[in-house]
Amino acid sequence: MTAFDQIPIEYLLPQRPPFVFVDHLLHYDEAITRTSFRIPEQGVFVENGHFATGGLVEHMAQSSAARVGYIARYVLHIPVTIGYIGSVRKLRIFRHPVPGEVLETTVTFREKIFEIELTDVEVRCGDELIATASIKTAGSDKVIDEA
């Protein structure tokens, strides 16, 4: 069993700083994946004292990608590949978080058809639900650089 929070996120994601919006994988099972991300004081998508919509969407997509990366590396023992956002549907943002807040995100697996995967994503700050979406991602054959 892997201690999820000890896994360097770079092992699971193709993105590299400053474009990484997941700090830790908190949990994985076949149905649910959880991640966390502390909003930085400054950086990409921090605008006017808030984490912008684009950042929330990218965080949700990267949380979904962390699930796929974990499965590849630790379940199937194959190289992690680059994926792409196919669509974001039913996006609802209830509040934009501020620097210093920690996002805790739950990715619920819905279905996979060939290399297309559908997930539902919920983003929380503490007990407060701040964003939801359904995200469709597509896999590729391009392997990420080993971290």
Language model segments and positions:
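Active-site helix/loop of acyl-thioester processing domains in fatty-acid/polyketide metabolism
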Residues: 52-77
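Hydrophobic residues on conserved beta-strands that form the core of alpha/beta folds
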Residues: 22-23, 88, 118, 132
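Short aromatic-glycine motifs in intrinsically disordered, low-complexity regions
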Residues: 6-16
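Hydrophobic beta-strand-centered segment that forms part of the acyl-chain substrate-binding groove
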Residues: 2-3, 68-104
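HotDog/MaoC-like acyl-thioester-processing domains
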Residues: 34, 98-101, 108-147
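Hydrophobic core residues within well-ordered beta-strands of beta-rich domains
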Residues: 19-21, 103, 117
